[in-house]
UniProtKB/Swiss-Prot annotation:
GO terms for cellular component: cytosol. InterPro entries: NA-bd_OB-fold, RNA-binding_domain_S1_IF1, S1_domain, TIF_IF1. GO terms for molecular function: ribosome binding; rRNA binding; translation initiation factor activity. Coiled coil: none annotated. The keyword Cytoplasm applies. Keywords: Cytoplasm, Initiation factor, Protein biosynthesis, RNA-binding, rRNA-binding. The lineage of its organism: Bacteria, Pseudomonadati, Aquificota, Aquificia, Aquificales. This is Translation initiation factor IF-1. It comes from Aquifex aeolicus (strain VF5). Component of the 30S ribosomal translation pre-initiation complex which assembles on the 30S ribosome in the order IF-2 and IF-3, IF-1 and N-formylmethionyl-tRNA(fMet); mRNA recruitment can occur at any time during PIC assembly.
Length: 80
């Protein structure tokens, strides 16, 4: 598979990036996040945050990447 094709597939998989606030910490690295739009989503921690032991607590501001397929689920990619 060429670089161009891989890049196109990676761009297609990217979700919508929004900011929000962690409302509740759930088991297994899951969090309930209230987005700036007012919507509440269920989000899990991205692998890089988990590997680097970035702590996320209720009340933290975070960037969430929403899945284009299911807008009620997302991935926390950055803690602000």
């Amino acid at each position: 598979m060429g670089k161009k094709k891989r890049k196109q597939e990676h761009e297609k998989e990217r979700g919508i990036l929004l900011e929000g606030e962690v409302v509740e910490a759930l088991p297994n690295g899951m969090f309930r996040v209230k987005l700036e739009t007012g919507q509440e989503v269920l989000a899990h921690i991205a692998g890089k945050l988990r590997v680097n032991f970035i702590r996320i607590l209720p009340g933290d501001k975070v960037k969430v990447e929403l899945s284009p397929y299911d807008l009620t689920r997302g991935r926390i990619v950055y803690r602000l």
